[in-house]
């Protein structure tokens, strides 16, 4: 029994606990709902207050508009009788307007009828008047008056045209006479020619400046390379190499003097000068260039030194030409003037102060390993001459110790360097690879070497090959100061016309200053004998000739290469 009671009590307690928990959850839910309802009530109260305010504003507006409507009704009731009066007055005015329009139309019809009647009467009167004698006279005079009026108008127009023409003639003419007009035209032509000359000079000057800028860039690059080269060497090694080079140079000069004496003895039999045919224009350009030597000494000396260096290369090329032409018996006699001219060239080259420095530079290029493009050094201006060495398009300035290439000098004194054929020049392919500066001498040597197997060399060609730009007497073919008027193409055209046959040796001098097309003929006389001999590398052969000098070269002509100031010039060959 007790157990059942305890069990039932436990059940009741559990039910009470469960029900208590349910009541607590329900109470919490009701509290949350009450809070939500309170919040909604607050919101509704706020909305109600806003609505009341809006209703109050609307009531105020309604009261204002009601008052305004009452005022409008009162004013309408007050203005209604006046409006009725205005309507009545409007109706009255409209009735009057219609009455006036009807009367105007009636008057128009009446007046139109009157006008038609008056026109008919006028026509009747005109007919009657035209039949009278006075009317006929009147019409005749009227026609005459109209004709006179038309004539006057035409005359006035013609007078206006004449006045305009006369005003044109009254303006003073720019040229009162034919002579003044011709003078003006000539002056204009002279000015245009002067302007064209100046433009040409400016273009030449700009081209020269561009060329100098390129040369300076090349020199700067080469100087940087030389500076790096000299940094790698010690001063003691440079002194030893310079001493060796001076000894070799002395031996080389002794061999050259011995060879020159032998050649002078053999060449005494052939005193006839053989020169290539050259045009008169080339000689005149030389004459104008000689006057510029005194004005531009630095530029001319620099350009001449270029040809001095290039002639050394030409001397090395001469043996190949001699070997190619050695098969012909007629061309053998042409070697003697070439050797004689090379003798004078070498004697002059020994007097050059900067000749040794060029030889020393070649060994430096060999040590640098630049075998494909050999660069030559541009000498410093410590001496009076500024020597530019252009070989394969590059120049280098050298103020310090320079070395010499051993390959350029033979170890035996039998053959000098200008008669020895280097290994690099034995084939025509190597000649084509070499890049000489663009000048008439280099163009001639290049064309001559390429055509060495087809035709024989003439004494005139050998003369050009051995020519030096700084020789004491001959400055005829000096293209370094020829004012850049004789280009390499023109020189080749003149040279291609030369007969390179040794049998025409006597015609070489006569054709030296041959008359070209469109040029004036020179007047020159020869004072040479067949008994002239060559002595000590210098020939007594000379010939004076006279020609007209340009007015620009008359004032600036130099007495260095010309012996007479009366348009007489005597050239000393060799």
From Swiss-Prot:
Ranges for the region named Disordered are 259-313, 549-574
**Is Phosphoprotein given among the entry's keywords?**
yes
Question: Could you tell me where this protein is found in the cell?
Answer: Chromosome
One of the Pfam families matching this protein, by short name: S6OS1
Q: Which portions of the chain have biased composition (kind: Low complexity)?
A: 264-275, 552-565
Q: State the phenotype upon gene disruption.
A: Mice develop normally but males and females are sterile due to defects in chromosome synapsis at meiotic prophase I. Spermatogenesis proceeds normally up to prophase I until a massive apoptosis of spermatocytes takes place at stage IV. Ovaries of female mice at 4 months of age display a lack of oocytes.
- InterPro entries tied to this protein: SIX6OS1 (IPR031380)
Cellular component terms per the entry's GO annotation: central element; chromosome
Which domain of life does this protein belong to?
Answer: Eukaryota
Q: Which PANTHER family match?
A: PROTEIN SIX6OS1
The annotated subunit structure for this chain is:
Interacts with SYCE1. Interacts with proteasome subunit PSMA8; to participate in meiosis progression during spermatogenesis.
Q: What is this protein called?
A: Protein SIX6OS1
